[in-house]
Amino acid sequence: MRQILEHLLTKQDLTREKAFNVMLSIMSGEHDDAQISGFLMALRAKGETVDEITGFAQAMREKMVPVSLDSPAIDMCGTGGDALGTFNISTAATFVVSGAGVKVAKHGNRSMTSKSGSADVLQALGIPIDKPVEESTKDIEEIGLGFLFAPAYHPAMKYAIGARKALATRTVFNILGPLCNPANVKAQIMGIFHPDLTEVQAKVLKALGSTDVMVFHGHDGLDEISTTATTKISQMQNGGDVNTYEFDATELGMARHGVRALY
């Protein structure tokens, strides 16, 4: 870890292999909270690259509990962290998409920044959030919508909890979670908390094997496709190039509203 820290403190990027190895060692419990905290803050100060995030995600995927599906599914989630406290929009959207006939492997957790996370919403509706892998798989295959509760599928994250709580600030883990769907979906819709990360995250998903993705950030600060402002979207279709563009919901005839309408 010392060599990695020196590397980061001198603003040198890690190769994908080095990023993979350091995250694998963290997920294996080889470092204490102080070392992990130092690593996370040095990385944040330097700024994360596509290769670094890809390597980290590959290591986390290696440690996760996998879900095997017989047919394609999509994930719909956000990083959170927009600090606007809206209702859980991505979870509501999953019911619409699933109702339209698209299978959804919803990967999520409890609230970190909003009024409620996907797990909180489902629990309030009386839906069990900690089903065995077999039951969640059956839900996705037969009903068209299943919930994959992140803590149950990423047990190795326990080694980073102490450092994350002590730092109490955004780190690379905030963008890694949505990249590590246990069902290894190839199609994904993702909201992100900063506009500079839409293209980065889309390129990481491409490197991880995704074929169809949309990563977006509303210019009102939302990690959603917004109806209160224009939205920056980075999109990849059929494994092609990542294209970034601006989207305005009013072009589809939707009225502009204030963010407070989403509370």
PLM regions and their residue ranges:
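Short glycine-rich loop/turn motifs that provide flexible caps or phosphate-binding loops at active sites
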Residues: 10, 28, 46, 77-80, ...
